[in-house]
Swiss-Prot record:
Protein name per UniProt: Taste receptor type 2 member 5
Subcellular location: Membrane
Record-linked SUPFAM superfamilies: Family A G protein-coupled receptor-like
Entries under PANTHER family matching the protein: TASTE RECEPTOR TYPE 2, TASTE RECEPTOR TYPE 2 MEMBER 5
Membrane topology: Multi-pass membrane protein
Taxonomic source organism: Pongo pygmaeus (Bornean orangutan)
Organismal lineage: Eukaryota, Metazoa, Chordata, Craniata, Vertebrata
Positions in the Cytoplasmic compartment: 23-45, 104-127, 197-223, 275-299
Family, as annotated: Belongs to the G-protein coupled receptor T2R family.
Glycosylation positions in this chain: N155
Principal cellular location given in the protein's record: membrane
Pfam short name (any one): TAS2R
Function (record text): Receptor that may play a role in the perception of bitterness and is gustducin-linked. May play a role in sensing the chemical composition of the gastrointestinal content. The activity of this receptor may stimulate alpha gustducin, mediate PLC-beta-2 activation and lead to the gating of TRPM5.
Transmembrane segments: 2-22, 46-66, 83-103, 128-148, 176-196, 224-244, 254-274
Amino acid sequence: MLSTGLGLLMLVAVVEFLIGLIGNGVLVVWSFREWIRKFNWSSYNLIILGLAGCRFLLQWLIILDLSLFPLFQSSRWLRYLSIFWVLVSQASLWFATFLSVFYCKKIMTFDRPAYLWLKQRAYHLSLWCLLGYFIINVLLTVQIGLTFYHPPQGNSSIWYPFESWQYLYAFQLNSGSYLPLMVFLVSSGMLIVSLYTHHKKMKAHSAGRRDARAKAHITALKSLGCFLLLHLVYILASPFSITSKTYPPDLTSVFIWETLMVAYPSLHSLILIMGIPRVKQTCQKILWKMVCAWRCWGP
């Protein structure tokens, strides 16, 4: 018999999953629609498509693990799931990093030659860095996952105790996240400095009146700030989710930590939708039509 708290956590997890499913689905459809309309992939559309696709996969992995985690305690399934999960998670982080670099390229305003050179070169240079680093990281992740995993012996149960070697295993698999996270923080910091500099100029010339560039700065920083907060929650909740599944498993703790984790791919999709005016207006129209239809057919 499920307790009230556990049932509430399951309900929250399902709601988050549905929100992310709709949000990421809307972003994928919008990206393809823009491609069909213009017959050309822009950098922004590719980033949004990759980000939404990775979040979509990450959501399903979390829900799959949450629903069937007892079956994944065997060495084979845990190993393969861990490798795929880490690759999808790191790909999602990389696309978010590219989004922050893209915002820097399009929005950042600096007059110094060094910053102008960095603005022109950093985006194209980071494309090659992403490709090379991601290929190396995929190979290392697969190699670590296939050779480092040593399941405990002498226990026929599917539940294995969480030992110290598994901390090192998880640490090595996630070691590829440090570089993109650093690039993300640097580019976000440059956006903050650019916003501060631009605000000082506008305050001196237009009595503090907000303009389109300042609004673009704030929209970008809101998106990046929400991503950073949700990603940190996801990273901090991951080890607790792993330890809560050890024998004997604590279902309440499992649902608490994985509900926090699923908020990362789900809620950030809404933040991205709110930052794209055309998608935001379309979603508002659809919601309004749904409300009107419900009122017409309701009692």
